[in-house]
Swiss-Prot record:
It comes from Xenopus laevis. This is Protein ripply2.1. The ripply homology domain is required for transcriptional repression. The WRPW motif is required for binding to tle/groucho proteins and transcriptional repression. Required during somitogenesis to regulate somite differentiation and the positioning of the presomitic mesoderm-front. Represses the expression of genes involved in somite segmentation by acting with the corepressor tle4 to down-regulate the transcriptional activity of tbx6. Also regulates retinoic acid signaling during somitogenesis and is necessary for the expression of aldh1a2/raldh2. Pfam families: Ripply. A motif (WRPW motif) lies at residues 29-32. Keywords: Developmental protein, Nucleus, Repressor, Transcription, Transcription regulation. Residues 1-69 are annotated as: Disordered. Induction: By notch signaling. By tbx6 together with thy1 and tcf3.
């Protein structure tokens, strides 16, 4: 490819649409987007090698091979303290990803009837 052709690839309308200066190929990283592919293949890190070696093992158990980020875990407000003390370790042991925990109000009438039984006795 000739040098003139390379310069014509990045037009001024392209640079104004992306908000990056002309001639810059730097993309803004967002954690919820897939990582951009590069032409240079870096050797895998120990952690990447571990996950790639165990990928088939994880798929055999029915777990998804990858997660779409951001991951949001929903937890009932009535069990908020349980989460903070006992069940948090178990949850994180079985779901080791970066996630946001969102508390929600339970609408199940079973939890309400249990509370009423305690006060009636």
């Amino acid at each position: 490819m000739e040098p003139n052709q390379q310069r014509s690839c990045g037009s001024s309308s392209d640079s104004s649409a992306t908000g990056t200066p002309q001639g810059s190929n730097v993309a803004v990283w967002r954690p919820w987007h897939d990582a951009p592919r590069t032409h240079v293949q870096n050797p895998p890190t120990a952690q990447q090698q571990f996950y790639s070696d165990n990928q088939s093992h994880m798929n055999d158990k029915g777990k998804p091979p990858s997660f779409q980020h951001p991951v949001k875990l929903f937890w009932p407000k009535s069990r908020c303290y349980d989460f903070m003390y006992q069940e948090a370790e178990e949850l994180l042991r079985h779901f080791p990803v970066q996630a946001t925990i969102s508390l929600y109000q339970e609408t199940d009438s079973d939890s309400d009837s249990e509370e009423e039984d305690i006060y009636e006795n």
